[in-house]
């Protein structure tokens, strides 16, 4: 899947400078969590949506808000509950008694970075309301289509399914996420650093730092990422990996019982986009096979 105009060295250098500035911005608010930071960068560069699973309190919300602040984007947080309605997410028509007309009130999904907190505590009907937004980057209210801003990134968090009050996400919803990542607790040294910064007032939000870049910078980075070169042989290797999940008994024998459903073509697209973004993060303008090894579990979880 070669590119006619692959990203050049100057573009990769420019990308590295911008990403370094974003990383420094995140570092003020998020201690450790290197895997989470990389996942955020992949989502930012590709526009692919992220599903993060962990127990509460591991900086998921903080990281999402910090990322929005780093790029100068609009941030919206939606707390998912069993009584949350689709209109609470996408918006609705409100009757204006003074004009005698219905007016459109856009919902919180019309932001650059949207956090769906504890998505698996909402009902399936509400979860499905996000499908059009996540895939088509648009919403429909009262028969009128509204385009979502660019860039647009959904970060959803979920608690482990065995916790009380959680619902299983349907396959159609899961398939919209580029990456699912499971976060772990910080180490003792990182937790001590959190307390040190707390005492020093580092986390105070009275004077938030200036954005590290602009939304136009993000759109430029996304364009650069799409032009990262992938050799046709590496693309074939990718397809073989994805195909193996559909013929699990042939490749992994007894372990096939743990695969409920093979990866869809959307997984191949996610693989391709994420591997290009990872190459850019690593300072390369081409993809190498080890990128797929690094991304296999998160993109197909």
Locations of regions flagged by a protein language model:
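Conserved AAA+/SF3 P-loop NTPase catalytic/coupling segment centered on the Walker-B
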Residues: 111-134, 167-171, 188-191
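Walker A/P-loop
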Residues: 45-80
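Loop/turn-to-beta-strand initiation segments
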Residues: 48-49, 111-112, 149-155
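Canonical AAA+ ATPase core
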Residues: 96-99, 134-213, 220-226, 276-278
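Conserved alpha-helical scaffold flanking the Walker A/P-loop in AAA+ ATPase domains
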Residues: 96-114
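Pre-Walker A (pre-P-loop) alpha-helix and adjacent loop at the N terminus of AAA/AAA+ ATPase modules
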Residues: 16-49
